[in-house]
Regions:
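Flexible "arm" and connector segments at domain edges
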Residues: 1-64, 68-113
Length: 113
């Protein structure tokens, strides 16, 4: 499946639960989806808290799937073509200078985003 097919499958699931209905107890707003995305990402972090190695790969896979589903939904309801955004970001990152002198080599020398 590609990103568009995964997004469609996610929307079908959400529709089947009635979560897009105006009276839903789980309003699927960009704000709520961003919060849920962050919470699920934090659940993925729990798999590494106080331990050096991953103990349950299947559980982590499940959390990563949750993160991905919320990401797909947030992008979609916000009108963002995630595939194009990813390609653009990869292009931006390829032309960026990265700080390799410090302990934090993930830091950029310049540029935003």
């Amino acid at each position: 499946m590609d990103i568009k097919e995964l997004t469609e499958a996610m929307h079908n699931f959400v529709h089947s639960k009635g979560w897009y209905e105006p009276d839903s107890k789980r309003p699927q707003t960009p704000r709520n989806l961003a919060i849920s995305l962050s919470l699920e990402a934090n659940e993925a972090l729990e798999h590494f808290q106080w331990q050096g190695e991953l103990k349950d790969k299947d559980e982590l896979a499940s959390e990563l799937a949750d993160v991905t589903l919320y990401l797909l939904q947030l992008a979609s309801v916000s009108g963002i073509d995630l595939e194009q955004a990813i390609l653009k970001k990869l292009e931006t990152n390829a032309s960026r200078e990265w700080n390799t002198e410090s302990d934090d080599s993930s830091r950029r020398v310049s540029g935003k985003g």
